[in-house]
């Protein structure tokens, strides 16, 4: 199954950092980052204000597992870049529910 994401009014294929299509995700929430957070840890997300994070699980340790989707630097193909990791839930506001869907 391929997947598309609605982002800023556009529906585009979801791709990983190498440009490969990814399976469809089923987030439990979509949140918007309200504070910057930078980390060097490979299993955590660095966040920018306005980033949308698709929440996959809410960990018992206080951190949430999520997927961050951004437009690629090469906007000619209108693809998205995907990054997954843990993030502090105090850095967001609820944006919407499940805007990712299978194609």
Curated annotation (Swiss-Prot):
Gene3D superfamilies named in the record: SH3 Domains (2.30.30.40)
Occurrences of domain SH3 (ranges): 26-97
* InterPro entries for the chain: SH3-like_dom_sf, SH3_domain
* CDD domains reported in the protein's UniProt record: SH3_Sdc25 (cd11883)
- Look up the record and give one Gene Ontology term from the biological process aspect: cell division
Q: Which SUPFAM superfamilies match?
A: SH3-domain
Q: Which UniProt keywords apply?
A: Cell cycle, Cell division, SH3 domain
Please give the name of this protein: Putative truncated guanine nucleotide exchange factor YLL017W
């Amino acid at each position: 199954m391929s997947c598309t994401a609605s982002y800023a009014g556009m529906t585009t294929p979801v791709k990983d950092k190498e440009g490969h299509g990814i399976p469809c995700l089923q987030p439990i929430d979509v949140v918007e980052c309200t504070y910057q957070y930078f980390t060097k840890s490979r299993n955590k997300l660095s966040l920018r204000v306005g980033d949308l994070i698709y929440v996959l699980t809410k960990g018992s340790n206080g951190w949430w597992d999520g997927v961050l989707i951004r437009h690629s630097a090469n906007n000619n193909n209108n693809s998205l870049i995907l990054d997954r990791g843990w993030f502090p839930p105090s850095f967001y506001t609820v944006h919407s529910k499940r805007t990712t869907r299978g194609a």
